[in-house]
Design a protein with these regions (language model features):
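Transmembrane helical cores of multi-pass secondary ion antiporters/exchangers
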Residues: 1-401, 409-411, 462
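Short, glycine/charged-rich beta-strand-loop motifs at protein surfaces that mediate ligand recognition
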Residues: 309, 417-422
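Cytosolic Rossmann-like ligand/nucleotide-binding regulatory domains
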Residues: 350, 423-479
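Residues that form generic nucleotide/phosphate-binding pockets
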Residues: 390, 435, 482
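Long, charged amphipathic helices and adjacent flexible linkers at domain junctions
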Residues: 396-419, 489-505
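Short, compositionally biased
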Residues: 459, 479-500, 515
Length: 515
């Protein structure tokens, strides 16, 4: 038998690093510094101290981060869901596409005219730095959740501009010939990737949902693995068909997010954990592939810091801000949305594409991307809570609820509905016996501040309560009106952000607890 000591040491190191990465989220909450900062800095320092760690090829990083990003986008799509996405679909699409093009163009112009970078490399660099990452924002906020339209826009913009940025970079890398021919090729390639990706995402999401509903499996754990395999299949099919696999899995996640299916909660928890792991892996990969001692060479430090500052203080607030003017947002919400365009895992992936292209100066561009991402996460991310408070962005603190009440049903419980009581709803202050229910409706459970409250006849409903009601499905519209405040202006819901928790907390839509 061969000596397994070295292999055991590798496993031990991986386990310790993983534990440290998870615990860093707790430290991040205390210091108000995004957890990805620790991943970046520690990995970069480790690559300097242990040169063998820096021998990862960019192809390896590209493949690993590609898979990681696919899971991140699918989880993000599930947490948005179709109902929330539909309420802001036009705004999300407009900001995701137009915002990406404007950010890429202005950043490329700044890189060319201010720092003398050639036009082709500048365009690639600008495109790589265009996508945003709301998961970094949510890691800074910790247990505080963004409410209203702002939260939907943050998640939706990132899910939209990630595939757009990737498709645009791929089109730029494939462009050859005269400027006119290259522009035409870029346009055709981009439109084809978007159309094919969206089409396969819709079809694949529907097929996967039917598969989840109609084909029972012998083991509970297999349900989550089936969805994981489905995500990989959708991504692979879209990629083989010359479409955007990232857009395909994001769209599939949106379609599945609001739907009912067996073991849906377990599936959501599994993919939320998988997305968190994927984000950790992506940032560690970026850190390991950059050596801090090499950054001063070629002025990567100074150029990266300058571009990071321009993106944070000029390009996004001013130029992307003009794009948001047609979108109905309060002034504070608009400013917060513009500040929170943080950079994350996608620039890592796009940087590996640039290096893999073999274009002159690609390694320098990758180092610049590292500095910009580090600046964005540390500086912009560090001020997110303060700016949210100053701009009166709606936030609510989510206390941890580690204990769950598991209830299993053999058949789909169509008559069991869950509602979160909105502030100002007609039911607030009303005792259970005085609720204007029909004869066939009963309050089964009442959950308040994470604790079970006896559902007695004299128990009064309070804002924020979770109410489980047994009623005929036809009663659902009336029940929604009873537990939901009448709002003026845009309609919005609140739900946990991607990566924060897999348990959903709808405010205006019923959630069937047996699914």
């Amino acid at each position: 038998m061969t000596d397994i000591g070295p292999f055991g040491l590798v496993i031990l190191v991986i386990g310790l690093v993983g534990t440290a990465a998870v615990l860093s989220n707790r430290l991040s909450e205390r210091l108000r510094v995004p957890a990805p900062v620790f991943f970046l800095v520690c990995a970069a320092a480790a690559s300097d101290l242990f040169p063998n760690l820096a021998r990862l090829s960019h192809v390896t990083v590209q493949r690993v981060v590609t898979i990681a990003l696919a899971f991140i986008l699918f989880d993000g799509g599930m947490h948005i869901g179709w109902r929330r996405f539909r309420s802001a679909a036009v705004a999300i699409g407009w900001l995701g596409i137009a915002g990406t093009f404007v950010t890429a163009g202005i950043t490329a112009a700044a890189a060319h005219f201010l720092f003398g970078i050639g036009w082709r490399l500048a365009l690639l660099l600008g495109t790589a730095l265009a996508p945003t990452d709301p998961a970094v924002v949510f890691s800074v906020l910790g247990r505080r959740e963004i409410g209203g339209r702002t939260g939907v826009m943050l998640e939706g913009e990132s899910g939209a501009n990630d595939p757009v940025g990737i498709a645009l970079l791929v089109a730029l890398l494939a462009a050859t010939g005269s400027p006119a021919a290259a522009a035409g090729h870029i346009a055709v390639t981009f439109v084809l990737q978007m159309a094919v990706g969206a089409g396969i995402g819709i079809a694949g999401g529907r097929l996967l949902l039917e598969f989840m509903r109609r084909v029972p499996l012998p083991n509970e754990g297999l349900y989550s693995l089936r969805v994981l395999a489905g995500v990989l299949a959708i991504f692979g099919l879209a990629t083989v068909a010359r479409g955007s696999g990232f857009l395909a899995v994001f769209v599939a996640g949106i379609l599945i997010g609001d739907e009912r299916a067996p073991y849906k909660r377990e599936i959501e928890r599994f993919h939320s954990s998988l997305a968190s792991l994927a984000e950790i892996v992506a940032f560690i990969m970026l850190g390991l592939t950059v050596r801090l001692r090499d950054l001063p060479i070629g002025n990567a430090w100074s150029i990266g810091l300058a571009l990071g500052a321009l993106l944070a203080f000029v390009i996004r607030p001013v130029f992307v801000g003009l794009i948001t003017l047609p979108i109905q947002l309060r002034r504070g919400e608009r400013l917060f949305l513009l500040w929170t365009g943080l950079k994350g895992a996608v620039p890592v992936l796009l940087g590996t594409f640039i290096v893999g292209s073999g274009i002159a100066g690609a390694s320098r561009a990758y180092e610049i991307i590292f500095v910009v991402v580090a600046f964005s996460v540390a500086v912009q991310g560090g001020f997110v809570p303060t700016i949210a408070h100053r701009l009166n962005v709606p936030l609510r603190t989510i206390d941890p609820e580690p204990w769950s009440l598991g209830v299993r049903f053999r058949e789909e419980p169509e008559g069991l509905h869950r509602f979160r009581v909105s502030r100002g709803a007609p039911a607030v202050g009303t005792s259970i016996e005085d609720l204007p229910f029909g004869e066939d409706a009963w309050v089964i459970f009442l959950i308040r501040h994470g604790r079970l409250v006896p559902a007695r006849s004299d128990t009064r409903i309070e804002a924020g309560d979770e109410v489980l009601v047994l009623a005929d499905p036809a009663e659902v519209p009336a029940l929604k009106k009873l537990f939901t405040a009448r709002r003026s202006g845009h309609r919005h819901t609140e739900r946990r952000p991607a990566g924060a928790s897999a348990r959903k907390e709808p405010t205006t839509d019923s959630d069937h607890t047996g699914t």
